[in-house]
């Protein structure tokens, strides 16, 4: 059994600027994860952009974890993971897999972020992420925790991104 989240954010920036000037900017990514989300690590491991704007990127991330005891018992106090993804410019869609540093065969996270123009200098971002934890007795608890962290981080991301855009307009 898995847990899926679908959420939408709106920003006062064009879809193209959000994608290329923010989301795939190493400066913005590091600031977002380290300052905005409180992660202890954000390292861009690889970044490849073709002439046709197809992008492949890998980030190594270490989030702050305020996990319940059953989750901490299984995952530990900290969790590091690699986010490996690919951007398709024809659909403005970022598709990614999250590979945790521990229990990668038992914990799977896959997601998509689709960016669409929603007016002059406005965009809407549709997020869909699925958490699948195959650990008897605690899998569902860990999935719910991961989904809750995703929701919280998306709220923080919205505030941080809005401030970033406002300060640079």
Question: Predicted regions: what is each one?
Answer:
Residues 1-67:
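Hydrophobic ligand-binding cavity/cleft-lining segments
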Residues 2, 39-40, 78-80, 106-108:
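Short solvent-exposed loop/turn micro-motifs enriched in small/polar/acidic residues
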Residues 10-14, 60-64, 88, 116, ...:
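Solvent-exposed residues in well-ordered beta-strands and their adjoining turns
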Residues 18-20, 127, 161:
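Hydrophobic pocket/interface hotspot
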Residues 23, 84, 140-169:
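A conserved amphipathic terminal alpha-helix motif
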Residues 43-98:
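Glycine-rich portal/gate segments that line the openings of hydrophobic small-molecule binding cavities
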Residues 46-48, 113, 155:
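Short alpha-helix boundary/capping motifs
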Residues 81-86, 95-147:
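Beta-strand/loop substructures that line and gate deep hydrophobic ligand-binding cavities in soluble
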């Amino acid at each position: 059994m898995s847990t899926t989240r679908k959420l939408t954010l709106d920003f006062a920036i064009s879809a193209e600027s959000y994608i290329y000037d923010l989301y795939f900017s190493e400066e913005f990514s590091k600031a977002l994860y380290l300052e905005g989300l409180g992660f202890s690590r954000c390292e861009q491991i690889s970044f490849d952009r073709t002439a046709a704007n197809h992008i492949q990127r890998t980030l190594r991330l270490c989030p702050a974890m305020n996990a319940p005891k059953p989750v901490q018992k299984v995952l530990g106090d900290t969790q590091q993971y690699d986010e490996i993804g690919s951007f398709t410019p024809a659909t403005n869609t970022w598709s990614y897999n999250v590979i945790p540093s521990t229990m990668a065969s038992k914990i799977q996270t896959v997601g998509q972020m689709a960016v669409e123009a929603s007016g002059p200098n406005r965009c809407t971002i549709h997020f869909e992420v699925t958490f699948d934890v195959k650990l008897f007795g605690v899998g569902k608890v860990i999935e719910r925790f991961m989904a809750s962290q995703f929701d919280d981080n998306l709220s923080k991301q919205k505030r941080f991104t809005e401030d970033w855009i406002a300060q640079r307009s």
